[in-house]
A protein has these predicted regions:
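N-terminal helical hairpins
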Residues: 34-37, 42-107, 111
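Extreme N-terminal leader/targeting segments of oxidoreductases
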Residues: 105-138, 156
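N-terminal Rossmann-like FAD-binding beta1-loop-alpha1 element of flavoenzymes
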Residues: 136-163
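Glycine-rich FAD pyrophosphate-binding loop
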Residues: 156-179
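Conserved redox-cofactor binding core of oxidoreductases
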Residues: 230-315, 371-384, 464-466, 476-478, ...
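Glycine-rich loop(s) and the adjacent beta-strand/alpha-helix scaffold that form part
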Residues: 323-378, 382, 564-584
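An anion/pyrophosphate-binding glycine-rich loop and adjacent beta-alpha core
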Residues: 358-509, 584-587
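Long, amphipathic alpha-helical stalk/connector segments used for oligomerization, subunit docking
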Residues: 588-679
């Protein structure tokens, strides 16, 4: 039976309307010759792109991105064709790339069944003896949950750890702000949870854009995280009988979230911090606070240290090690206004990217649906209201636009609006999940209602989060338990408030301090805001970037959440990476360094990197501009929010790229940094961070423009269902976008890591 492959360009308009630089889809058809002599198409793929100027009839023979050739038909027949079954071209492309060593991306995912990959991998990685560990240094940049847990565990194993953070203390890391909880597949509620369900919910929540093996590993180790934290003394909430309590978060139908009131991040960070302090006291961790990473140093192709700036003295310092671990968090502050701490930045990760590490899925950003709305242009920070509030709070807007206008103008109180005049739109649209749909779904729905004129605050960009029903429900339950009159409305209301206060008291207090309204008596006002970044440095299964010896963990990497993170999974990933994954995988790399000896920081590579940083700082300090750093940061944030926020389109993304390019040129021409570089200078620190944001912002827009589909938090207006839901394109975009740095950001090279799913069926997400 004869077989052949053909290649053709997919023209969507007359050929003469294209320019030579236009990128077209290549259609690959695999034919099977039937007994009657006719050819039948048994499979076709349109996942490859080619610029018109690069196309010719022999394009496929030379193109390294898609090495399938007609001469490969024997390979196809031997490896992929079983009688009349069609070939899976996505799997074929992956196999061919790996067999010919063409792709620069090697995920290093172990072979074998999905549920055995991690245990098998752990049993086969090389180890380093305790006697050799004491001679090996590891630098960890960032001491939040991921970095702090990694520092403590690596030092406990015997490595010498050099930890760096730009805060006064690792207790000031942004991890402390996490509120709602941490997921784990312990099934304490007996509601059908399991490792597989946590794995599946995470894959589905990420809209099938994450690496299957990494996500399953995360679900596997989740239970161990809870055991570790309980052993440290983390005061998780408990039921009356003393068992650990759970609650639900968005995108799931079980209760698997462990929590410590509304301060879960703080308590988990204190656990990691205490473990770190034990190793600091033993001399195994050298803690360097108020130090900011300026560059990574690569010697003989390996990460061997970093350059830092002492934020107090301004001194540029050289620090060497056998490996470097980045745990520097996400880049939400690219938007200027976000729920992130003011100092959170992308600089450490971006410096590594500029030295050769690929940056994955930069446009995959999470917009959290429950945040305190923007109240004015003077703001520089937004405040999160935990997703846990959606367990008991009901989200609504008025059914009638005229009622919304009256509420905005102060003519009507929300508590005076009848139930029949309220639109609980999430419950209406998604009856199965209701108010606990995933964050990207809830955020887009809130935006749609406000854009349609139903917003309830003065700016028209807010919806209500109402606890009145929960207060009465809990109050009646409490009254029944106590044998009290459930018809006594004031008594029931008082009892219900007590239950809500026990669950969310600190969150309600924080809301009242900021907004000056009592959420026990009137609904909260909320609106989506930038909260988390799923994108980050590309890493393999071992959490190593494309720079040997350089690892990225926690929010600094792209690893586990695809196009949308489920609530309470950030803390899970950070602690999984730090406590359980990295300490196992890094040994395999460091096994080659047991005879290396100390790494010198006096090499030409270190000196060159230090000189380059000093020159850059001198250039910024001597600039004769007149505009503040915040002036540029705020404009950048508005460009990104308006053009690359909750919804995107080709026109706006192209506009954003041009605007950011123009803004970056103006920044280096007009920025003014006051003070001097040899003392504490927050203006200088900000300027260096914003300079990196101005480059990342362009790549962010380029990435969003290149992905012609909607998935998770990446919503392209051109690609949506009739109901306004995200419309994925699995044939063409089932891959991780990994970008190679180019000084001309718009020309950054895209590498694709194709995603294969063994245990999950690809289907459109539905939460109805």
């Amino acid at each position: 039976m004869n077989k052949k492959i053909t290649y053709s360009l997919n023209y969507r308009k007359p050929k003469n309307e294209y320019s030579s630089d236009d990128e077209l889809t290549v259609c690959v058809r695999y034919y099977q010759k039937l007994d009657n002599g006719k050819n039948k198409v048994v499979k076709k793929s349109t996942g490859i792109k080619c610029k018109l100027k690069d196309w010719d009839s022999d394009w496929h023979k030379a193109d390294n991105r898609h090495p399938i050739k007609a001469s490969d038909s024997n390979y196809l027949e031997k490896n992929r064709i079983l009688k009349n079954k069609s070939v899976d071209l996505h799997s074929l492309i992956k196999d061919l790339n790996e067999s010919k060593n063409i792709s620069p991306l090697n995920s290093k995912v172990p072979k074998g069944p999905l549920d055995l990959k991690w245990s098998t991998h752990k049993n086969n990685v090389r180890l380093v003896s305790p006697a050799n560990k004491r001679n090996i240094d590891i630098i960890v940049v960032g001491t939040g949950l991921a970095g702090g847990s990694a520092c403590a565990t690596l030092a406990e194993q015997g490595y010498n750890v050099k930890a760096f953070c730009f805060q006064d203390s690792s207790r000031r890391a942004h991890s402390i702000a996490a509120q709602g909880g941490i997921n784990a597949a312990k099934n304490y509620q007996g509601d059908g949870d399991s490792v597989y369900r946590l794995f599946y919910d995470t894959i589905k929540g990420g809209d099938y854009r994450s690496r299957e093996a990494n996500v399953h590993r995360l679900a596997e180790v989740s239970s161990s995280i809870i055991d570790q934290c309980v052993a440290q003394g983390v005061p998780f909430a408990r039921e009356y009988g003393g068992l650990l309590d759970n609650r639900s978060f968005g995108g799931v139908l079980v209760s698997r979230t462990f929590y410590a009131k509304g301060q879960t991040g703080q308590q988990l960070l204190l656990g990691a911090y205490s473990a770190m302090n034990r190793q600091v006291a033993r001399g195994k961790i050298q803690m360097n606070t108020r130090h900011e990473m300026m560059d990574i140093v690569i010697v003989d192709g390996k990460a061997r240290g970093i350059i830092t700036r002492n934020l107090i003295t301004g001194e540029i310092e050289k620090h060497s090690a056998h490996a470097v671990v980045l745990a520097s968090g996400g880049y939400g502050n690219l938007f200027y206004l976000s729920t992130n701490a003011m100092g959170s930045n992308v600089s450490a990760a971006w410096k590594v990217h500029k030295k050769g590490a690929l940056f994955a899925n930069p446009s995959f950003t999470q917009i959290h649906p429950t945040c305190i709305p923007v109240s004015g242009d003077y703001q520089s920070k937004l405040t999160l209201m935990s997703e846990s509030l959606r367990n008991d709070g009901r989200i609504w807007v008025p059914k009638k636009i005229e009622d919304a206008k009256k509420i905005r103008n102060g003519e009507l109180r929300p508590v005076d609006l009848n139930e029949n005049d309220r639109d609980y739109y999430l419950e209406r649209r998604y009856p199965a999940f209701g108010n606990l749909v995933p964050r990207d779904v809830a955020s887009r729905a809130a935006k749609e209602r406000c854009d349609a004129g139903y917003g309830v605050n003065k700016t028209g960009e807010a919806v209500f989060l109402d606890f009145s029903s929960a207060i009465i429900r809990y109050g009646k339950e409490k009254a029944l338990v106590k044998g009290l009159d459930i018809e006594d409305f004031e008594l029931v209301k008082s009892l219900g408030k007590g239950v809500i206060k026990a669950k969310y008291g600190n969150l309600f207090q924080m809301y009242e301090k900021i907004v000056d309204e009592n959420p026990y008596e009137t609904p909260m006002m909320i609106y989506p805001a930038v909260h988390y970044t799923m994108g980050g440095l590309w890493v393999d299964y071992n959490l190593m970037t494309t720079i040997p010896g350089c690892y990225a963990i926690g929010e600094a990497n792209f690893s586990d959440h695809g196009a949308n993170r489920l609530g309470a999974s950030a803390l899970m990933q950070g602690l999984a990476d730090g406590y359980f994954v990295l300490p196992n995988t890094i040994n395999d790399y460091l096994a080659d360094d047991i005879k290396t000896g100390p790494i010198s920081s006096d090499s030409p590579e270190f000196n060159k990197a230090k000189n380059r940083i000093e020159e850059k700082i001198n250039k910024i300090m001597t600039n004769k501009g007149s505009k503040s750093v915040d002036y540029f940061h705020k404009i950048l944030g508005k460009i990104i929010w308006n053009n690359c926020g909750m919804s995107r389109n080709k026109k706006d993304l192209n506009s954003a790229i041009k605007e950011i390019q123009k803004l970056r040129k103006e920044f280096y021409k007009s920025v003014k940094v006051t003070g001097d570089q040899f003392s504490f200078n927050e203006s200088l620190a900000k300027a260096l961070r914003v300079a990196d944001f101005l480059e990342l912002g362009e790549l962010f827009a380029v990435d969003a423009l290149s992905r012609n589909e909607s998935c998770g938090g990446h919503f392209r207006e051109e690609y949506q269902t009739k109901e306004g839901e995200a419309l994925r394109n699995d044939d063409d975009y089932r891959f991780v976008s990994a970008w190679e740095y180019n000084e001309n950001i718009e020309q950054s090279k895209l590498h694709r890591e194709h995603l294969d799913f063994e245990s999950v069926e690809l289907k459109n997400r539905s939460y109805k």
